[in-house]
Amino acid sequence: MSHSVKIYDTCIGCTQCVRACPTDVLEMIPWDGCKAKQIASAPRTEDCVGCKRCESACPTDFLSVRVYLGNETTRSMGLPY
């Protein structure tokens, strides 16, 4: 199942999210916006299983990577749409 994965410019280029992803959804790409000169990218969101290990691994105060599960999460929790 595919999920929306967003990478924010608060990414510090640490690679923790990339290493945590069990389905290789994430990769690092060159970026001049941080000291590490790289940022996470999510080119294979169709492989995302929604485990959110990338979010858990992110060391920034504001999570630089977020997984949005969509309506199936709301349904599974029994909440109205």
UniProtKB/Swiss-Prot annotation:
GO terms for cellular component: chloroplast thylakoid membrane; photosystem I. PROSITE patterns: 4FE4S_FER_1, 4FE4S_FER_2. It comes from the Eukaryota. Residues 2-31, 39-68 form the 4Fe-4S ferredoxin-type domain. Its cofactor is [4Fe-4S] cluster. Its EC number is 1.97.1.12. It is an enzyme of class 1 (oxidoreductase). [4Fe-4S] cluster 1 binds at C11, C14, C17, C58. [4Fe-4S] cluster 2 binds at C21, C48, C51, C54. It catalyses: reduced [plastocyanin] + hnu + oxidized [2Fe-2S]-[ferredoxin] = oxidized [plastocyanin] + reduced [2Fe-2S]-[ferredoxin]. Transmembrane segments: none annotated. It is found in: Plastid, Chloroplast thylakoid membrane. Disulfide bonds: none annotated. Binds 2 [4Fe-4S] clusters. Cluster 2 is most probably the spectroscopically characterized electron acceptor FA and cluster 1 is most probably FB. Signal peptide: none annotated. SUPFAM superfamilies: 4Fe-4S ferredoxins. Apoprotein for the two 4Fe-4S centers FA and FB of photosystem I (PSI); essential for photochemical activity. FB is the terminal electron acceptor of PSI, donating electrons to ferredoxin. The C-terminus interacts with PsaA/B/D and helps assemble the protein into the PSI complex. Required for binding of PsaD and PsaE to PSI. PSI is a plastocyanin-ferredoxin oxidoreductase, converting photonic excitation into a charge separation, which transfers an electron from the donor P700 chlorophyll pair to the spectroscopically characterized acceptors A0, A1, FX, FA and FB in turn. The eukaryotic PSI reaction center is composed of at least 11 subunits. This is Photosystem I iron-sulfur center. The lineage of its organism: Eukaryota, Viridiplantae, Streptophyta, Embryophyta, Tracheophyta.
